[in-house]
């Protein structure tokens, strides 16, 4: 006689020590923890103490630090636990090969590309929080998902919102997708004021608690630019179907407009656990301890058209999508170098977009990527060219 109880789902979390990873473990705990889920792999970077605590408490079978120099520290932290330890690129690829039904891909940057692609090819369901997979290697990644047979479950709040309201049998009737943005700390700033922005003022996001780099990317709208490129790949859209609207309350996370004039939207309090929980439980909806909206208290929702003069990153996203090929990888690579220079005080806030566009123009001749080597080459060339331009002082 069978009890009817299903076996625990096997999960891996790439980037468990970051914000997305920590929230994922929080959601797993709320949804029954070890009774319903079996953690195969956790990966992190330099925070080995947190990674070790997570591995012990979750019962993970393998813990991986992306940095080889932290291998011995992680090994000491997990001594006697029975949890296997690995490190570096080979460790991340070992993590990708482990038997997990569902993978949270939350490693920040290009380091997450290879292991996430490998997990997709293996057929795992990919809960995607790594932007580079689609921005830099969108065509290759979508192909890997299709060949592997797994599902692609977006975790970014905007893309998760679209995923939730998208009527699968009505994709042909999609007229536009509208990504919302809070507008960040400089939504009402003048162009002159934005010329004098510092890293400290740029990090103050009005609605979300985030790290330094992502906060600055949000303030400059580069984060939204990357999300536009992601949306194109996720939902097979044309560039002219993707719009951005400022919505300072961050209650509507995105909208889908159809050919009959209908617009469907997903609303909710700004809490990443909603998107994570939906990706983890899809197609069911889990019960989560997140804030419930009180529309009487909310009273109003505001919207504004973004100004591409003050936020040129949005225009660069359209340029990258129109050109196609490896322009997404070039945009991202150049932006990363410009962002570091801004944080260090070597580059003005608005000059991040100037240098990124110059690099995109200089490398517009690069052919489409036939494989990951071409993606990494485009990224490397973009970073080198951005550094050269700053050294030559060709931008502000």
UniProtKB/Swiss-Prot annotation:
GO terms for biological process: isopentenyl diphosphate biosynthetic process, methylerythritol 4-phosphate pathway involved in terpenoid biosynthetic process. NADPH binds at residues 17-20, 47, 130, 132, 211. Pathway: Isoprenoid biosynthesis; isopentenyl diphosphate biosynthesis via DXP pathway; isopentenyl diphosphate from 1-deoxy-D-xylulose 5-phosphate: step 1/6. GO terms for molecular function: 1-deoxy-D-xylulose-5-phosphate reductoisomerase activity; manganese ion binding; NADPH binding. Keywords: Isoprene biosynthesis, Manganese, Metal-binding, NADP, Oxidoreductase. It catalyses: 2-C-methyl-D-erythritol 4-phosphate + NADP(+) = 1-deoxy-D-xylulose 5-phosphate + NADPH + H(+). Transmembrane segments: none annotated. InterPro entries: DXP_reductoisomerase, DXP_reductoisomerase_C, DXP_reductoisomerase_N, DXPR_C, DXPR_C_sf, NAD(P)-bd_dom_sf. Mn(2+) binds at residues 156, 158, 227. Coiled coil: none annotated. 1-deoxy-D-xylulose 5-phosphate binds at residues 131, 157-158, 182, 205, 218, 223-224, 227. Its EC number is 1.1.1.267. Its cofactor is Mg(2+); Mn(2+). Catalyzes the NADPH-dependent rearrangement and reduction of 1-deoxy-D-xylulose-5-phosphate (DXP) to 2-C-methyl-D-erythritol 4-phosphate (MEP). Belongs to the DXR family. This is 1-deoxy-D-xylulose 5-phosphate reductoisomerase. It comes from Rhizobium etli (strain ATCC 51251 / DSM 11541 / JCM 21823 / NBRC 15573 / CFN 42). The lineage of its organism: Bacteria, Pseudomonadati, Pseudomonadota, Alphaproteobacteria, Hyphomicrobiales. The gene is dxr.
């Amino acid at each position: 006689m069978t009890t009817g109880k299903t076996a625990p789902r096997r999960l891996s979390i790439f980037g468990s020590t970051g914000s997305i990873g920590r929230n994922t473990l929080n959601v797993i705990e709320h949804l029954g923890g070890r009774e319903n889920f079996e953690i195969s792999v956790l990966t992190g970077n330099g925070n080995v103490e947190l990674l070790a605590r997570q591995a012990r408490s979750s019962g993970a079978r393998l813990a991986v630090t992306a940095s080889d120099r932290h291998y011995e520290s992680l090994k000491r932290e997990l001594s006697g636990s029975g949890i296997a330890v690995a490190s570096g690129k080979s460790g991340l690829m070992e993590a990708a090969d482990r038997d997990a039904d569902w993978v949270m891909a939350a490693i920040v940057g290009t380091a997450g590309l290879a292991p996430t692609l490998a997990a997709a090819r293996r057929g795992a369901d990919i809960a995607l929080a790594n932007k580079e997979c689609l921005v830099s290697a969108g065509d290759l990644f979508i192909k890997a998902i299709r060949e592997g047979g797994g599902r692609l479950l977006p975790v970014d709040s905007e893309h998760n919102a679209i995923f939730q309201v998208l009527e699968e049998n009505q994709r042909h009737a999609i007229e536009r997708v509208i990504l919302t943005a809070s507008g960040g700390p400089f939504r009402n700033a003048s162009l002159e004021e934005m010329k004098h922005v510092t890293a400290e003022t740029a990090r103050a996001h009005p609605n979300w608690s985030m790290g330094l780099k992502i906060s600055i990317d949000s303030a400059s709208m580069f984060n939204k630019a990357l999300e536009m490129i992601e949306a194109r790949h996720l939902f097979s859209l044309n560039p002219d179907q993707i719009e951005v609207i400022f919505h300072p309350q961050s209650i509507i996370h995105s909208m889908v407009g159809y050919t009959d004039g209908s617009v469907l939207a997903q609303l909710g309090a700004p809490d990443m656990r909603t998107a994570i929980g939906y990706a983890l439980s899809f197609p069911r909806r889990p019960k989560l301890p997140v804030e419930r909206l009180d529309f009487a208290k909310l009273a109003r929702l505001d919207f504004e058209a973004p100004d591409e003069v003050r936020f040129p990153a949005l225009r660069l996203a359209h340029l990258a999508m129109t050109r196609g090929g490896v322009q997404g990888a070039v945009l991202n690579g150049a932006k990363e170098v410009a962002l570091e220079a801004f944080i260090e005080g070597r580059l003005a806030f608005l000059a991040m977009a100037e240098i990124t566009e110059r690099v995109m123009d200089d490398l517009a001749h690069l052919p489409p990527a036939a494989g990951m080597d071409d993606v990494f080459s485009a990224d490397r060339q973009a970073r080198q060219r951005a550094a050269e331009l700053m050294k030559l002082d060709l931008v502000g």
